[in-house]
Amino acid sequence: MAGANEIDMVISVGKFLQGNYEEVFEEIQEIKLSCRDAKLKVILEAGLYPTPQDLYRACILAMEAGADYIKTSTGKDAVASLYNAYVMCRAIVDFHEKTGVKVGFKAAGGIVTTQDALLYLTIVKGVLGEEWVNTTDFRIGASRLANNILSAVTKEEVKYF
């Protein structure tokens, strides 16, 4: 297979918060169609939503439009919190129960220590269940965590990622 296996896109948070839901939905849907066989990961920028309800609705909209994964953040803006991860996982559960479609979850931004990673794992296990705890359905984007682990193992400062 030539080309990308996955495509990342960032949801238009501003358009969503202005109530332009149809426009955001269509944008995600168009990108999904362009992906062909590649998986679409929609980055929510979870730290930018004023309420948990807004974040939840954005997750549902992204999944209904065709997201194969939803991701907390790029790490460039306000990073997601553990509570945001919980809200996103609840949205995945509700969507799965309604449609039978299994959507993956990726936590990213601000995950620096193994303790941070374990907290996200605990949320995924507790909310989504054991069947989501695999490399396909649950991921952690944590370049600083990787550097910290490599530094601890090699006993030298590593800034590889």
Annotate each language-model stretch with its function.
Residues 111:
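Short donor-sugar binding/catalytic loops of nucleotide-sugar-dependent glycosyltransferases
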Residues 108:
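Terminal helix/beta-alpha structural elements that buttress the NAD(P)+-binding lobe
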Residues 1-105, 114-143, 153-161:
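Alpha/beta enzyme core
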Residues 145-149:
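Short C-terminal tail/terminal secondary-structure segment
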